[in-house]
Each structure stands twice: as C-alpha cells, then as structure tokens.
C-alpha cells in the first residue's frame, strides 16, 4: 500500500559552463518519484550509460549540487540544503580519516537533524547492523573499500536519513565483495524500512536488487522509462529476470542508439 511520495523530482535540468565559456546540458527535465516505504523498505535504481549525468543527478537530489531548473521535493517540501535527510554516498566513500569508526558516526549525528543525538545504544545498534562491532576504534584509512562503505552506511543511518543515495558502488569490486555489499544493503533496507536509490550502468545488478528502475538516457540525461520489478519472480536464473533485462537492453538500443555500458 502506497502512502504518498517520499521523493519527487520535478523538471530538473542542469547546465555546466566549459573552459571556453561554452554551455552544455547534462540533465534535461528529469521527472521521477519514489513512494514512502511501508514495510521492508524500498530499493530503486537509475540505470544509464556511462557519462550520462547520473552522478550529477544524485548530487542534485542530495542538495550538494544545485539544479539549473526544476526542484527536488522530500515529503512535499523543497529540499535544497543538505541536512542529513538525504545522504549521498559517492563511488569512493569518504570519512574523516582522523576520526575512528565511532567518532565518524557520532559526528554524522551531530550535524544532522536526528533527534536521537548522543544515543549510544542507537549507535551501537547501527555499528552491529553494518558489521563493524569490534572495530569502533579503528580508522577508515587503514581499511578496505568494503570497510569504508560500511562506515558511510552507518553514518547515513545514524543521521536519520530518509533516503540514502549510493552512486555506482560496485563498479570496481570483485564478485565476492560485491555480493557481500549487496546483501548488506538489502538487509539494512529491510531492517530500517529504508529508501535507497542507487545508480549503475550494470543492468543485471539493478534488475536483481531493485523494486523500481528508472532508465536515464545518454547526455543530456532524461528519464525515458520507469519499470516496476515483480519481486516474487526475482531469481537470477528465472525467465522473468531474463525478459526484463532483455527489455531494458532493447529500450536503450532504441532510445540512445549508442548505449556505452560498462
């Protein structure tokens, strides 16, 4: 049962100016919405060719970047200033290297609107949920990508984020780490009834883990198709999954003609 939209993007466009003063368009009239999760969270994805503006779109949603036109709404209110309501995790997640795991999470709470500030029980619960129990005193720069990614997820959850944006997180990971991170994200989405939006150029990944998929065209990026996934039929070897992947590939071929996927 839907309870209204958590995220709405209305006619968002973005232009940049080149070094010679030339103006070029990255995004063109983006429109999409994600409903409020009821139980079990919601996992949506944006699939696009490489260099199509999906990272720019994620930054606009999180209010790190300003749109040239249009607006982003969170629960019906314009969202244009980062406050922890929307948290963006880039392809290479970053934390404060001079802070240990627990300090990084505590700082995320301090700068957010989360009413549960200084709630050590909540912090310990989140540390456990992301698999970092016993590593509270460790520093992020000492560890692997997977470790730093877990810190970023913990910071987002501790800040009370209503939406977590994850930008192409699996591109450079080997299969074992990738599967581990995917399972972690899915578990956290369910446990915390969390809305997660991630971007990728990998059709297979998106179809296997998403409830909803948005197709973003080659630059200037436009959302030209929205696909709902029937989760009851989601099995890696199923004919249904194969047919959805085939449909997406054909849609891109017909729309862009030059799909530059990874």
Label for each model-derived stretch:
Residues 62:
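Helix-to-loop junction immediately C-terminal to a conserved catalytic motif
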Residues 92, 99-111:
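Q-loop/switch helix immediately C-terminal to the Walker
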Residues 153:
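Hydrophobic anchor residue at the start of the ABC signature
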Residues 70-82:
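Conserved ABC transporter NBD signature motif
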Residues 139-143, 147:
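Conserved ABC ATPase signature
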